[in-house]
């Protein structure tokens, strides 16, 4: 969410004071969402349904960077993969919340042709990606991490 948005500020304040953030504050907010046929959007829709949050006002895009840019301009809240936090444009205008929900887990695969020699650069990429994602160092870039209903 945008740092100037009241709902985002309420969520951040709950995190700062050690209270569980009430996602119900998002109920009447605008959202910048990915089109529903995109896999991440399907996961977000499932999450919102489980949290009983009805989206009444949404702008749709195919691109997460566009969603972040629009959120930075306070056009609404968006959902992005955790790794998007690191490279987010207009980082200073945004508040990031790691919701740590199984509904939002988005698998990542590296696919290459079987029985082919993997080039050293490709192997280095796979190893670097695995180390980065397993280290969860990206989590430190979130403004608030909610783990099993408790702010961390």
Q: Which residues fall in each region the model found?
A:
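Residues at the C-termini of beta-strands that transition into short coil/loop
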Residues: 1, 35, 98-100, 114
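A bilobed periplasmic-binding-protein/Venus flytrap-type ligand-binding module shared by bacterial periplasmic
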Residues: 1-2, 7-12, 108-118
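Low-complexity basic/metal-binding stretches
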Residues: 1-6, 15-18, 145-148
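Residues embedded in well-ordered beta-strands
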Residues: 5-7, 32, 77, 95, ...
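Secondary-structure junction motif
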Residues: 15-23, 27-51, 118-127, 133-144
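Hydrophobic hinge/microswitch elements
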Residues: 37-96
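C-terminal effector-binding regulatory domain of bacterial HTH transcription factors
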Residues: 50, 82-91, 101-152
């Amino acid at each position: 969410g945008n740092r100037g948005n009241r709902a985002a500020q309420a969520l951040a304040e709950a995190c700062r004071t050690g209270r569980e953030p009430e996602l119900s504050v998002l109920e009447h907010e605008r959202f910048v969402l990915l089109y529903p046929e995109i896999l991440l959007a399907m996961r977000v829709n499932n999450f919102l349904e489980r949290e009983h949050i009805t989206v009444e006002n949404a702008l749709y895009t195919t691109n997460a960077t566009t969603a972040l840019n629009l959120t930075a301009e306070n056009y609404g809240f968006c959902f992005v993969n955790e790794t998007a936090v690191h490279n987010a444009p207009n980082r200073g205008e945004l508040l990031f919340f790691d919701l740590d929900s199984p509904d939002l887990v988005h698998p990542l695969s590296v696919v290459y042709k079987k029985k082919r020699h993997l080039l050293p650069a490709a192997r280095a990429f796979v190893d670097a990606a695995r180390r980065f994602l397993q280290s969860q160092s990206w989590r430190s870039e979130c403004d608030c991490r909610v783990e099993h209903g408790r702010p961390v």
